[in-house]
């Protein structure tokens, strides 16, 4: 099937989905969850093929772990689907409205976007997460996963499509591009006749490629060069716990701390405490000259930070450390090197906290809390399809409402404008 045909089929499926009740959609999602569990053995057989190829191609242990499915992980994915069932359906919600002077009733009603294209890398769980979020919001979806997950994605999409057919819903509501040729990504990005939004989930290179080549609106995000600024009035022991959590809990995530900013006045006191606190966490430091001289005395594994490393999403236990004179210099650094994802200040000053929140341009700004909270589940949104760092349409974790738009509905009594 050509990509154009896939787009046409998705558009037709979206028209049907837009007419479904919440109960119809939840029934389909329930069957998807059940079938994931019932067919877990088949899924694991296909996933094993991806794992074998990954090992043969020398992929890192971290990537292989993201690729790996187990019975427990499949059960967890099914549990996530059931959680989506429990969420309120935003479609059809009346956002606001009123009665106009003419007597016309005006309502702003939440509706699906239509067809969403999602391009992502080596995470088979994303296949199910995205498909079910789109179904819950009456959107059709065209998936293009990384070549590393090709076997896993094929079987997962088949399970979903079979479940849709069992409930009388169009299987083309969820489709996948399984050819690894990158030209298909480029073709998808030009399919504006059928696709209403593109959501890339991956590194900076993928986001930039989509932004440069798409004729469809693209949600940019997911790349997190996140900062924590330790201001001189911060409670240092509590600050150490926040930094530890933000850096070491899950280093590969986009909400992980990458650059630590420390106020100059407390650097000689605070940095030795930091090294002692993280000594068993295998953190590698990349420091500016002032921080380097302090960290070397603590026998830390440290090197001089390079300018390009300040723009790097490490995705590992590497940590940049930069000394700043004051909050103005901290904000200036974040403005220059941040990716508008998640930024934090640790301080006892309400005035400086307010200044930081007001002036730092990011999807999520934290006062005395870890950047790791930037997550749909943590924000009470249920699941998320991505984290947007742009300002138009959606910003931050994208839950169900972010997969919708709205239309104005006017109801009159054969009313004409005077």
UniProtKB/Swiss-Prot annotation:
Source taxon at top rank: Bacteria
GO cellular component labels: cytoplasm
EC numbers, comma separated: 1.2.1.41
Disulfide bridges in this chain: none
Substrates-to-products reaction catalysed: L-glutamate 5-semialdehyde + phosphate + NADP(+) = L-glutamyl 5-phosphate + NADPH + H(+)
Pathway: Amino-acid biosynthesis; L-proline biosynthesis; L-glutamate 5-semialdehyde from L-glutamate: step 2/2
Group of enzyme by EC: oxidoreductase
CDD domains the record matches: ALDH_F18-19_ProA-GPR
Any single GO BP term: L-proline biosynthetic process
Localization per Swiss-Prot or TrEMBL: Cytoplasm
Pfam families, per the entry: Aldedh
Keyword Magnesium applies: no
GO molecular function: glutamate-5-semialdehyde dehydrogenase activity; NADP binding
UniProt KW keywords: Amino-acid biosynthesis, Cytoplasm, NADP, Oxidoreductase, Proline biosynthesis
Family, as annotated: Belongs to the gamma-glutamyl phosphate reductase family.
Function as written in the Swiss-Prot or TrEMBL entry: Catalyzes the NADPH-dependent reduction of L-glutamate 5-phosphate into L-glutamate 5-semialdehyde and phosphate. The product spontaneously undergoes cyclization to form 1-pyrroline-5-carboxylate.
Protein name per its UniProtKB record: Gamma-glutamyl phosphate reductase
Organism, as annotated: Histophilus somni (strain 2336)
Lineage: Bacteria, Pseudomonadati, Pseudomonadota, Gammaproteobacteria, Pasteurellales
